[in-house]
């Protein structure tokens, strides 16, 4: 297996690359799974819902998130040597190096470094690009923030674009997305739960006007002034004006109307992502959300990773790790829960759907000790593959272990190959 090591902020000759055609439903695909600082490429057979492990690259810090250009064969990978991705990994975080590295994606899915990495101000928690693929947008959680960076004509990461002062970036940003019109940006800010020593920080979805790479404040969507509103991730319906938002500690899927490049102040619908009544459950949280390419279904990750003691060993303490499947009413946008299916691993932080809508790939994040009668077994992080049926429900197909010590599987994505 080929493995490439990427140096932090090294000077690397730029390589001009031809533009690829936009991905389509028949494109060949690669799955990328980030385990610590290693980004592993898998070949994909969508017809049989199988993966084949191929090459990997190593970043200067743990991979946080990645984004594939819609118009050229490049993958932009955000990384950091600090932050919560290091928790429980056995690696001590330093927290002094953060960046984005551009890779050219070849037809096999192998990655080649393209240009010098761009240094970032702090740990990036999410990365995306604008609709034409001319700029990168990066979200930061602590302190909360957002930055915009040019993508140069050759596909390399360019300069950061200065922004006006006074941007309302909330508390603990978790995701940044560009609206389909390319005229607005949303920063999903989670806030923080109250503790014995600190008051609750409210959550909100911050909406910015986006004009030629410049952000200006437009709206703050914060039902109940953001208290009890732990907004984490959102996704857009492909053809209707609906936005689907996960509320992390509330284990809830909210549906908001998208209108005039902003969001409605209150949700149209709120539904539990759990099989029961849902609500706040200790150790149980929602993760990311993706709308099916046909717009008829929406999928949400449910995570549980708490532990309890068993003969001196911390073992899984209960809860559910599953994907919630909702059918979307095409007239109103109302989601109806039709399935919760276990992910065959622990803490499904991220997942992805292939462009044809036939396969869903889950990244089960954590290593977990599990009680097995009178003994304890260890379940490593893994990539689980599911078939998506015509009715939207999922069938489990395969799992692939990706253990590297106790490093987490922090991100998984599907990318169309050139």
Task: Specify the residue positions occupied by each region the protein language model found.
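Residue-level detector of Asp-centered blade-edge/turn motifs that repeat once per structural unit
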Residues: 24-27, 70-72, 129-133, 180-181, ...
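Short, solvent-exposed loop/turn segments at conserved positions within beta-propeller repeat blades
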Residues: 34-35, 84-97, 139-144, 194-203, ...
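Short loop/turn segments immediately following beta-strands, especially the blade-tip
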Residues: 42-49, 102-110, 148-157, 207-215, ...
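Surface loop/turn motifs at the tips and blade-to-blade linkers of beta-strand repeat domains
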Residues: 56-60, 116-120, 164-169, 222-227, ...
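Asp-box/WD-like beta-propeller blade repeats and closely related beta-sheet repeat scaffolds
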Residues: 111-180
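Signature of short aromatic-glycine-proline-rich micro-motifs recurring in repeat-based ectodomains
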Residues: 173-175, 231, 280-293, 348, ...
């Amino acid at each position: 297996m080929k493995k490439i090591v990427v140096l932090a902020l090294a000077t690397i000759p730029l390589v001009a690359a031809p533009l690829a055609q936009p991905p389509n439903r028949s494109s060949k695909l690669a799955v990328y799974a980030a385990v610590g600082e290693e980004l592993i490429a898998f070949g994909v057979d969508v017809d049989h819902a199988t993966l084949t492990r191929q090459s990997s690259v190593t970043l200067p810090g743990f991979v946080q998130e990645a984004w594939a250009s819609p118009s050229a064969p490049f993958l932009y990978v955000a990384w950091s040597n600090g932050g919560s991705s290091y928790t429980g990994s056995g690696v001590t975080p330093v927290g002094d190096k953060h960046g984005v590295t551009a890779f050219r994606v070849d037809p096999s899915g192998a990655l080649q470094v393209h240009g010098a990495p761009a240094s970032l101000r702090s740990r990036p928690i999410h990365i995306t690009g604008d609709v034409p693929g001319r700029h990168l947008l990066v979200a930061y959680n602590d302190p909360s923030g957002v930055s915009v960076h040019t993508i140069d004509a050759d596909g390399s990461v360019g300069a950061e674009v200065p922004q006006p002062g006074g941007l309302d970036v909330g508390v603990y940003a978790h995701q940044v997305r560009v609206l389909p019109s390319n005229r607005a940006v949303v920063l999903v800010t989670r806030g923080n739960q109250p503790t014995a020593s600190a008051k609750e920080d409210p959550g909100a979805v911050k909406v910015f006007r986006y004009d030629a790479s410049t952000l200006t404040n437009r709206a703050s969507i914060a039902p109940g002034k953001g208290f009890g509103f732990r907004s984490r991730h959102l996704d857009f319906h492909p053809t209707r004006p609906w936005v689907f938002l996960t509320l992390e500690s509330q284990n809830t899927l909210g549906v908001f109307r998208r209108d005039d490049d902003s969001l409605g102040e209150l949700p149209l619908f709120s539904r539990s992502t759990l099989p029961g009544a849902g609500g706040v459950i200790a150790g149980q949280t929602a993760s990311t959300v993706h709308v099916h390419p046909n717009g008829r279904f929406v999928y949400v990750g449910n995570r549980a990773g708490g532990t309890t003691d068993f003969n001196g060993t911390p073992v899984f303490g209960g809860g559910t790790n599953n994907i919630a499947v909702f059918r979307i009413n095409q007239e109103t946008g109302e989601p109806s829960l039709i399935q919760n299916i276990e992910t065959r691993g622990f803490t499904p932080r991220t997942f992805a759907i292939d462009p044809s809508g036939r396969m869903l790939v889950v990244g089960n994040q954590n290593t977990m000790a599990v009680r097995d009668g009178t003994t304890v077994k260890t379940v490593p992080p893994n990539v689980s593959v599911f078939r998506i049926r015509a009715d939207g429900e999922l069938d489990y197909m395969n799992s692939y272990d990706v253990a590297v010590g106790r490093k987490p599987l922090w991100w998984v994505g599907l990318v169309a190959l050139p």
